[in-house]
Amino acid sequence: MNLNKNLPTGTRDKLFREAQAAYKIEQQVNHYFEKRGFKRIETPVIEFEDVFSSEHQADAKLYRFFDEKGRLTVLRPDMTLPIGRVVSTTGVTLPLKLSYSGKIFRANEDFGGEQNEQTQAGIELVGYPSIKAEIECILSGIGVLNALEIPNFQIELGHAAIYRRVIHLLNLPETAEIDFRLLIQNKSLTGIQQFVANNPSTLDDFILALPRLFGPAKAILKQAKNLTTDKGILTALSEMETIVEAVSYTADISVDLGLVQDFHYYTGIIFRGYADLAADNFLSGGRYDHLLEQFTSFSSPAVGLALNLDSLTTLQNRAGIIKKQAPTILLIHYDLDALPQAEKLMQETPNSELSFFDTSTNAISFAQKWHIPTVVHVSNQGIQTIFQKEADL
């Protein structure tokens, strides 16, 4: 079967206006991070599988292949772990404020509608234990969305320690923990009621309420504090309150106390970004204070933010924000010995381009086909207009 005209599942081409919009968004995001003092970092698209083994060892979403020495390598499925590898192996001095953008690859199931190749940009604050690091990530995310003019977006907060604390106190075996995780993620009221009946604990009231503990931040956090006396959960709720108070002036902030991230390295505040025109979140991140332990003997506090730039491009398109490229208004046909004059004219004339045809007849035909209103001929004798489209009445 010849596949030379096909694309792998979950990949797609971007043409013209969409490709230009995606390029500009990546530029805007990187420029915004640079203005906030972040230093850019780049890592290879190809990594050894061991970099992701702790997070993805039972995950079939990796693109795996062997290198020339028979070692198992992968296309990176996220950017955070490679940056953790860099920080832990290069001896760079902490703390650090890092930014990045690039491609990630995840082998999602066929027909799921997910893109296996995504463009991601983000930031990592490594070595900052203060809650100000979470606040900086959230403010940076909000700032990017405002700069991109994304309409009606909302930031949702959760806390990884809440779910971790519940699991710790329940002391569930691994299979039961997986089932419970799915119940929480799916907000299954009847399933959680049955679970509590089979696994009674001092957290019964809190667990039963978890599927409903999402919505306006201040009201939900106040309600949650009345449902438990556990110090670990109350500490997590207090951290969320602190962040809500700090950033609520910038955007609509909601909470979801049943928010469980797919990546298990999160240890504290987690957050996502949604918008009315988007089917899924396009912004995610949180605190992961033990990430470096996978690569070295020491740990370091860290907080990260990731943005799906492909989703943001789609959002801009749906919102009518993406502008058409300015049309070419002048085609410059030239003789080879007059190239310097033609180049100078193009540099001085906005929305102009050079003709690559040998004859003026072909240049004029091209202009008519692509609705370019004016064609000039540049020679050593000067500049002559050889085609002028009649003005529309």
UniProtKB/Swiss-Prot annotation:
<dbReference type="GO" id="GO:0140096">
    <property type="term" value="F:catalytic activity, acting on a protein"/>
</dbReference>
<dbReference type="GO" id="GO:0005737">
    <property type="term" value="C:cytoplasm"/>
</dbReference>
<dbReference type="GO" id="GO:0004821">
    <property type="term" value="F:histidine-tRNA ligase activity"/>
</dbReference>
<keyword id="KW-0368">Histidine biosynthesis</keyword>
<comment type="similarity">
    <text>Belongs to the class-II aminoacyl-tRNA synthetase family. HisZ subfamily.</text>
</comment>
<keyword id="KW-0963">Cytoplasm</keyword>
<dbReference type="InterPro" id="IPR004516">
    <property type="entry name" value="HisRS/HisZ"/>
</dbReference>
<dbReference type="Pfam" id="PF13393">
    <property type="entry name" value="tRNA-synt_His"/>
</dbReference>
<keyword id="KW-0028">Amino-acid biosynthesis</keyword>
<comment type="subunit">
    <text>Heteromultimer composed of HisG and HisZ subunits.</text>
</comment>
<comment type="function">
    <text>Required for the first step of histidine biosynthesis. May allow the feedback regulation of ATP phosphoribosyltransferase activity by histidine.</text>
</comment>
<dbReference type="InterPro" id="IPR045864">
    <property type="entry name" value="aa-tRNA-synth_II/BPL/LPL"/>
</dbReference>
<dbReference type="InterPro" id="IPR041715">
    <property type="entry name" value="HisRS-like_core"/>
</dbReference>
<comment type="pathway">
    <text>Amino-acid biosynthesis; L-histidine biosynthesis; L-histidine from 5-phospho-alpha-D-ribose 1-diphosphate: step 1/9.</text>
</comment>
<dbReference type="InterPro" id="IPR004517">
    <property type="entry name" value="HisZ"/>
</dbReference>
<dbReference type="GO" id="GO:0000105">
    <property type="term" value="P:L-histidine biosynthetic process"/>
</dbReference>
<dbReference type="GO" id="GO:0006427">
    <property type="term" value="P:histidyl-tRNA aminoacylation"/>
</dbReference>
<protein>
    <recommendedName>
        <fullName>ATP phosphoribosyltransferase regulatory subunit</fullName>
    </recommendedName>
</protein>
<dbReference type="GO" id="GO:0016740">
    <property type="term" value="F:transferase activity"/>
</dbReference>
